[in-house]
Amino acid sequence: MKKRILSILLLCCMVLTLLPTTVLAADGPMDTIPKYDVSIDVYNRTSDISIKDSRSYYIYSSVPDKLRDTWAWDKKIFIKGDKAAPHVFIDGVNIKMSPSSKGPAIELNKKASAYLYFIGKDSTLQGADGRAAIQKNRSEGQLYVLARTGTTVTCKGGYRAAGIGGSWAIRNIGDSMFNMDMYGHGVNMHFGSQSNPDYWGGTINATGGEYGAGIGAGSWGHSGHSGNTIHGGAGERLYFYSGTVNASGGRLAAGIGGGFRGRGSHIYIYGGNIDAQGGDTGAGIGGGSWTTKQDMDGINAASDIVISGGRVSARGQYNCAGIGGGQYVPARNITITGGHVSATGHYGAAIGGGRWCHGKNITITDATLNLSSLYHFTNSNASAIGFGDLVYDTEELVTDPSIATNDQIRIGSYKGKLVQLKLEARALSRDDEYSYFWNLYETLIPDENGLIDMQLLTLPYVQNYGWAINVLEMTVIDDPCNGNHDFGWVNRQSCHVWACRNKDCQARDPAAEMSKQNGKHVPGDWGVRERRCAVCDHLLEKDTAAPVLEVLNDGESYTVEDVIVGRPGAYSFTVSDPAKSGEASSGVKSVTINGVE
């Protein structure tokens, strides 16, 4: 009996080894392309592809090459159920849903997860009206989208839907667009690979339909009950690791983040080349557009945006920040710890709040920045980092910074680097005149925590400039002094500034106690030949010209006074002209002072 049981167990083990291996969701995305469990050709297929398991699928199109640019499949890939987490490899598939079909090109439904890999030939996906191209409407489950290096996938959302993410958040059962899973969320979505970024370095293009984000939330919609409106879903918990991502929001929506009247938050960029452009009144990365001012501490503020690597370019549209708030949307908790970041605001901050709104708790370290509030084109009062237009009158602000709130805007380096700035700002001159300054260069030393409070950035000849920077370039550089700075007074723009005197460094610590004495030179008393600053001992004036008296007569006495050096003493002397009587004098030959010739 025992031998029979052992034989049965051995047979079961042999059978199990012959079964295809299924990759489970817990394993995460694959590093390379595997052997597939299922292959499906969509060319001439007349029904949706429905997936309810976690196997690996290869979905391709055998359409002839001469038809590939014009032929499109009009069915969807439907991934359904909380047990589903398939790995779907898509090769050269073009899906274009009819506007009235109510279908995304690829749909995750009923809490499903999915790993989508675009390989081989390029693919294009178009959602129906109200539907995203790749739609994930719930916060449950996760979506990974990866493109093989050399492959491009282009996703376009339908009217009121995201390119990748949420549908139109319509909950009115009487609306023809309605179905039960239309929450408008674009949540818990991942792009690229952390473990094999070079392999998965392809291009993902995502464009939202009107009111929908490129990647993130769809538009708000009605519930169908009088006065009861459901706002747009959330564009949050969005993660970017590798490859190129080009995200463009539809009108009133962010490139990455919130749709119209939808929030954009918890966005994390670890690598890749990310280009995000908002639609009209949408941020590049962050919040969508609102019609009333949102609360800084409320759920609709653009918040918790983290960039630690890669190259990021973000452009906000009218009334919006590049990274942060859309129209009427404040921003908080933005952290950048590396990478190259370019951001442009349009009446919003480059990084921070949209128009009428603050940006708060923004920390940028060990990164390269190129930021602009488009002041030259708009005359906006928005800052490069912090507040949007119409929050402050900048002339009043730089004249009296006490009117401002402490928004905790900080730059620096956690790696012992110096921070180098090139900027344009509005500030007060050394004569207290309000003016615009450009091509201002600074090299700064972070404090013991590696940070620099931008509100402390002031110089006696560009007073309080840290409050109203409009254009900012920032890099971090090695410290030539290795932290052992030769601090002292240096002369800059006819002012004394406490800084490192090493000519290869010249950095300053804006938080140093001695920096409080930075200012215009204070003339001290005259010495015998020199006059110096009473604070820093910088030479201000030097007396090098001897006093001159003209038309001196023989035998008369004169007194000479050196007025320039403050009359240190007066000397009487007698002039002697040795010319004989009747002869013309050839000039004074000697002067006798106090009996000494």
Language model regions located:
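Positively charged n-region of N-terminal signal peptides that target proteins for export
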Residues: 1-10
